[in-house]
């Protein structure tokens, strides 16, 4: 009977140990309780993501957004700041720092200004206005601010209409009405994904290129990178992944979320410069050059394209 040399056995042991360490690094490192029944799982979600009061009256978010289509990708830097109760501001910059868009959401709706063209657009419905301008997330800036902060009360209905057990653990809760029609929770009561109908006002890059979308037009928003899985204190997901029809996707990587009290009114103002061309979106769509700022469908030099590979930020 022959035996492998000691050096070979030592190498095999080292490889096995490295594999075990890699598996351990990939597994969630949290001490949260797990739930095997849907009702306790849903209650854990409500206790953590619905019922707590907001930490402050406002916030300041720094994030990067990668919008990908099957043929291109566009990366921008995003700052979202202001009061949860509005007004809220969002500034969008190219990766090289060039300001692409300035937006303000308040009780009057959404106002957006594009400095390079000196053009402004407005709509009384902030959700419709944002989607006409190419923002991929299917809800208002306020709802986006809430979700980034780990608060879902403005989107998720109270009582599900049906419940499904998932083979991998966790549960899927379906709703017949509201912006969110499906909420998937993991076994810790944390949002894993949400689904809902896509507004007729938002068009994917394929649709803007003239390709029809067959079947249901739906969006799926996945949540990843919870800080407690890395041994940090529990907090909101730091990566939001939006999947859209025809292969479009948007990945929002949250770099920082800071609670802020009582923003000064002038800090949230959006004054248009003299000579800016203004256009209401109430009865006509935004021009393609405006909606391409986020999706990168226009001139790459203008839109801050960084040669990112589609799908590279999953």
Predicted regions span which residues?
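Gly/Pro-enriched, hydrophobic low-complexity segments
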Residues: 161-288
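Edge/loop elements at the starts and ends of beta-strands within beta-rich repeat scaffolds
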Residues: 51-59, 71-74, 81-86, 166, ...
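N-terminal leader/targeting segments and the immediate start of mature chains
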Residues: 26-75, 283-314
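An acidic-aromatic
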Residues: 87-143
């Amino acid at each position: 009977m022959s035996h492998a040399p000691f050096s070979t056995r030592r190498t095999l042991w080292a490889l096995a140990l490295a594999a075990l360490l890699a598996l351990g690094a990939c597994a969630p490192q949290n001490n949260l309780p797990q739930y095997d029944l849907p009702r306790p799982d849903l209650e854990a979600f409500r206790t953590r993501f619905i019922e707590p009061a907001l930490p402050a009256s406002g916030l300041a978010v720094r994030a990067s957004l990668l919008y990908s289509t099957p043929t291109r990708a566009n990366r921008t830097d995003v700052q979202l700041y202001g009061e949860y109760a509005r007004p809220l501001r969002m500034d969008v910059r190219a990766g090289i720092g060039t300001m692409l868009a300035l937006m303000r959401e308040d009780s009057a709706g959404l106002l957006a200004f594009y400095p390079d063209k000196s053009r402004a657009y407005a709509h009384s419905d902030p959700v419709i206005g944002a989607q006409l301008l190419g923002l991929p997330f299917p809800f208002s800036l306020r709802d986006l601010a809430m979700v980034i902060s780990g608060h879902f009360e403005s989107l998720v209905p109270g009582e599900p209409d049906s419940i499904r057990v998932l083979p991998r653990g966790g549960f899927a809760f379906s709703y017949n009405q509201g912006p969110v029609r499906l909420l998937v929770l993991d076994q810790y009561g944390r949002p894993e994904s949400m689904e809902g109908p896509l507004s007729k006002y938002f068009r994917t890059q394929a649709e803007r290129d003239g390709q029809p979308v067959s079947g249901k037009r739906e969006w799926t928003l996945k949540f990843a990178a919870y800080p407690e899985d890395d041994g940090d204190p529990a907090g909101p997901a730091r990566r939001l992944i939006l999947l859209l029809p025809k292969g479009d996707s948007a990945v929002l990587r949250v770099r920082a979320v800071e609670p802020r009290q009582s923003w000064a009114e002038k800090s949230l103002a959006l004054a248009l410069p003299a000579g800016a061309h203004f256009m209401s979106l109430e009865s006509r769509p935004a021009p393609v050059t405006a909606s391409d700022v986020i999706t990168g469908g226009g001139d790459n030099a203008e839109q801050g394209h960084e040669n990112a590979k589609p799908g590279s930020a999953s």
